């Protein structure tokens, strides 16, 4: 599948910060915003794939995104990444909180350490990144925050209790922040992807059989990929959704 061709003129020259942008869904979003003419920075812990993405996007658009290497489990690193993005881009009007890791772990195997690790990777940094970026958006007169959740917490999946908890928590966080930041013209929405097939998912978890089972549950009988999330994210980031906040948009091919 190729990236959607729709253009959102208001995104041109807009400062955009994407977390977890070095691969998978995040990389598709970084590329898409760059194609819209936005000024893009992204955070990732993995340097090799991130630098390769910068080269690819620069070759395609003539402008390389700014890569910030950081471990988002560290709150000070989150704050430093936000400050670096603002300094590099001049402003951040769009924040996409995408970084996550869906490790599998049985109920009996969960420890205090693994529980805290999952919430740190999948929930905590979203709040602190919003906290760091919001003052910049307030000074600019507004902005859009897009938080990536998942339909996983709606599926009764037995092997991801901590991950499901984090992804459910993102919905509560989104609604709370929308209420707090709305008076400052900052919109906060969430996207809940379904089974998005990425290279990492294929390598670690998915089989042809599991993909087929999920497609059977979907109304749309095809495999969903990262590019399927580009259009919805661009829409929420742009002024086309100017009256939309505190909402959770499910992109799952019709499971729900």
UniProtKB/Swiss-Prot annotation:
Active site residues of this protein: 163
Superkingdom classification of source: Bacteria
Pfam family of the protein (one): adh_short_C2
PROSITE patterns: ADH_SHORT
Keyword NAD: yes
Binding positions for NAD(+) per the UniProt entry: 20-23, 71-72, 98, 163-167, 196
Entry annotated with the keyword Signal: no
InterPro entries the record matches: NAD(P)-bd_dom_sf, Sc_DH/Rdtase_CS, SDR_fam
GO molecular function, one term: oxidoreductase activity
EC number(s) per entry: 1.1.1.-
Entry-linked CDD domains: SDR_c
Residue numbers binding substrate: 150
Disruption phenotype: Cells lacking this gene fail to grow on galactose as sole carbon source.
Keyword terms of this UniProt record: NAD, Oxidoreductase
PANTHER family, per the entry: OXIDOREDUCTASE, SHORT-CHAIN DEHYDROGENASE/REDUCTASE FAMILY (AFU_ORTHOLOGUE AFUA_5G02870), SHORT-CHAIN DEHYDROGENASE_REDUCTASE FAMILY PROTEIN
Reported function: Involved in the degradation of galactose via the DeLey-Doudoroff pathway. Catalyzes the oxidation of galactose in the presence of NAD(+). Uses NAD(+) as a hydrogen acceptor more efficiently than NADP(+).
Family membership noted in the UniProt record: Belongs to the short-chain dehydrogenases/reductases (SDR) family.
Protein name: Probable galactose dehydrogenase GalD
Gene from which the chain derives: galD
């Amino acid at each position: 599948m190729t990236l959607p061709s729709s253009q959102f003129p208001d995104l041109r020259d807009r400062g955009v910060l994407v977390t977890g942008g070095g691969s998978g869904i995040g990389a598709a979003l970084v590329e898409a915003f760059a194609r819209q003419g936005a000024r893009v920075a992204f955070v990732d812990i993995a340097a090799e794939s991130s630098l390769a993405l910068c080269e690819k996007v620069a070759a395609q658009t003539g402008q390389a995104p700014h890569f910030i290497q950081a471990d988002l489990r560290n709150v000070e690193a989150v704050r430093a990444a936000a400050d670096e993005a603002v300094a590099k881009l001049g402003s951040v009007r769009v924040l996409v909180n995408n970084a996550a890791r869906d490790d599998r772990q049985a109920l009996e195997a969960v420890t205090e350490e693994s529980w805290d690790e999952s919430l740190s990777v999948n929930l905590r940094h979203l709040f602190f990144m919003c906290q760091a970026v919001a003052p910049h958006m307030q000074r600019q007169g507004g902005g859009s925050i897009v938080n990536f959740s998942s339909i996983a917490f709606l599926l009764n999946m037995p092997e991801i209790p901590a991950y499901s908890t984090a992804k459910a928590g993102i919905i509560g966080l989104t609604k709370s922040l929308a209420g707090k930041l709305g008076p400052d013209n900052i919109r906060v929405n969430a996207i809940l992807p379904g089974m998005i097939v990425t290279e990492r998912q294929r390598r670690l978890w998915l089989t042809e059989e599991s993909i087929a089972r999920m497609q059977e549950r979907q109304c749309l009988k095809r495999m969903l990929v990262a590019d399927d999330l580009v259009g919805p994210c661009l829409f929420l980031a742009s002024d086309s959704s100017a009256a939309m906040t505190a909402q959770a948009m499910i992109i799952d091919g019709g499971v729900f």
